[in-house]
Amino acid sequence: MRNKFINLLGSICFCWGVVACTAEPPKEIRSGEIWPDNQGVHVNAHGGGVLYHDGTYYWYGENKSDSTSSAMVGIMCYSSKNLTDWNNEGAVLPVVLNDSTSDIVQGCVMERPKVIYNEKTKKFVMWFHLELKGKGYAAARSAVAVSDSPTGPFKYIRSERINPGVLPFDMNETQRAMLDTLDAEKYKEWWTPMWYEAIHKGLFVKRDLQGGQMARDMQLFVDEDGKAYHIYSSEDLSLIHI
């Protein structure tokens, strides 16, 4: 009996040792290392944002090449259950190849894509920073696309500057009256103390009021009450707007 017990104990220890030796250690997120997707290709999702929906993480980002910062492919999506293993879902908002009049024609700039889920419409809504092809960074537009699925395809809706003709609601009457005193011709030299003072008084808000405010680096946030916020750098990257 004693020998049988010893043999059984030895078998249990051996099996446990085999399991312990063959079990894969938990994966870690390692900053600065190449991060391959499920196809062994480096994840290509720059300036991205992550949406968590129904137990899955969706990572949206810019597809970038080594030779240009322009959009040659479009907005990519990767999905994961654990934030370490990522499946390539492809270009969920590809650039347009056969229409030179499109805002998102190949060669434009598509940056900082963020996606949220609209509970009312049951749509996935993407916002991103858009610069028109051949215009450098002068457009400074926000663009919107929607999809029925987190993995696309997303349908491009439109792009525009933010709130044309609308002043920030937190500007009081004194601040609004101050805008009439600001003459852009007096502040052609940037980064001076006088220029900074004029910026804080609303020099660029006044400059861009008619066409709408600039929107570049950006983020989306949905509060517990379902209200969504668009947070972005504006006024030539000098201030943050919400």
Model segments located where?
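Bacterial Sec-dependent signal peptides at the C-terminal "C-region" and cleavage site
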Residues: 18-26
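Beta-strand initiation motifs
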Residues: 27-30, 84-88, 150-157
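Short consensus segments that form the blades of beta-propeller domains
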Residues: 39, 65-71, 103-106, 132-138, ...
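Hydrophobic core segments of beta-strands in well-ordered, beta-rich domains
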Residues: 46-70, 90, 111-137, 145, ...
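Blade-loop segments of beta-propeller domains
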Residues: 76, 83, 87-119, 130
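Asp-box/WD-like beta-propeller blade repeats and closely related beta-sheet repeat scaffolds
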Residues: 129-222
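Conserved small/polar residues in nucleotide/adenosyl-binding loops
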Residues: 240-242
